[in-house]
Amino acid sequence: MAHMNPTPVLEAGQDKTMVLNMGPQHPSTHGVLRLLLEIDGETIVRIMPDIGYLHTGIEKTCEAKFYQQVVPMTDRIDYLCPMTNNLAYVLAVEKLLGLEIPERAQWIRVLCNELTRINSHLVWLGTGAMDLGAMTVFLYCFREREELLKLFEAVAGQRMMTSYFRVGGVSLEPPLGWFDRVKKFADTFPSKMDEYEGLLTQNPIFVMRTKGVAKITKEDALALGASGPTLRGSGIDFDLRRDMPYSGYDKFKFNVPVKTEGDVYARYQCRIAELRESCKIVQQALAGMPEGSIKADAPKVVLPDREKMKTQMESLIYHFKIVTEGFTVPPGEVYSAIESPRGEMGYYIVSDGTAKPYRVHMRSPSFANLQMLPSMCTGQLLADVVAAIGSIDIVLGDCDR
């Protein structure tokens, strides 16, 4: 019986070329990515990505879950920015429900999302630099990342799979002193950025390995569905936080870094500048954090406070019904997209009026950005494939789902 999804085969051309397998177990593919490479000496003639090694069927699984039970599953898609995935999903459900989210909850979401963006970019910077031989940067980046993971653990109870956002707001009020800890991090982070840039930006070896390497034109980037720093590194000035604001982003002032060269170095510059801009947004959120509730006034959707459950029978009944039966969502369909660290993260949800989604589809930036690889790498040297993969910052859980 024929296999439903046969393994891709790349045949060698004339006797000058040969075919190599890179991955799926390879440290520089940043996950279980397999690349079939046809090479002529050290030059890439053709490249074919082979994905699916991390496929979990998560979209289908969502159809068997209550709407609120899907939130922890979104953490596992792009595991380097779980709160970003949480936000994209809950915004879609809230749009179907027509919920109005309190301003404080929106600002906490923005604050946590920018901390998540910094966290994700630190992993990209540290691992991408190490792929090119810059070991010191990796150690510095993970020094700051550890502080961020401690902040996530303090506010959400988990270092990585946070599940902090809820349909209707956030799960808990940040603990006492948490905002002060975030402020301390944001105040010191620019000096840490200076350290990273001092090691890389003008480093002649790093510049030689990245400038003019793995170029992608803006026409190809648009045609293949690129987004995020991969798109902006090719000269397209587009950021969903600014151009289609959500969760109160229209109240924040920040710049969108854009470069026109389209090479690895341009994408590096975009993300480095983005780290600084995210830090500025964090500082603005801390300075202007509004008072008020962290949950929408929707007792049939949002779990009541535990204190109310102890004294109000109605709250206890609502809690029991939400946990055991879920909440129903009006029939309809919606697409909601946000700007994740890797680009446009979108959720398309179809509701049939029950407590479980009829269909959930995730538009993941890593899957779209991976399509750039053949255009980037054809004609490049074999060693430059590592730099190209690092520059598009893919996460295979985000690709395969």
UniProtKB/Swiss-Prot annotation:
InterPro entries: NADH_Q_OxRdtase_suD, NADH_UbQ_OxRdtase_49kDa_CS, NDH1_su_D/H, NiFe-Hase_large. The gene is nuoD2. It catalyses: a quinone + NADH + 5 H(+)(in) = a quinol + NAD(+) + 4 H(+)(out). NDH-1 shuttles electrons from NADH, via FMN and iron-sulfur (Fe-S) centers, to quinones in the respiratory chain. The immediate electron acceptor for the enzyme in this species is believed to be ubiquinone. Couples the redox reaction to proton translocation (for every two electrons transferred, four hydrogen ions are translocated across the cytoplasmic membrane), and thus conserves the redox energy in a proton gradient. It is found in: Cell inner membrane. Keywords: Cell inner membrane, Cell membrane, Membrane, NAD, Quinone, Translocase, Transport, Ubiquinone. Its EC number is 7.1.1.-. HAMAP family: NDH1_NuoD. The keyword Membrane applies. Belongs to the complex I 49 kDa subunit family. It is a peripheral membrane protein. The lineage of its organism: Bacteria, Pseudomonadati, Acidobacteriota, Terriglobia, Terriglobales. Pfam families: Complex1_49kDa. NDH-1 is composed of 14 different subunits. Subunits NuoB, C, D, E, F, and G constitute the peripheral sector of the complex. This is NADH-quinone oxidoreductase subunit D 2. GO terms for cellular component: plasma membrane. GO terms for molecular function: NAD binding; NADH:ubiquinone reductase (non-electrogenic) activity; quinone binding. It comes from Koribacter versatilis (strain Ellin345). Disulfide bonds: none annotated.
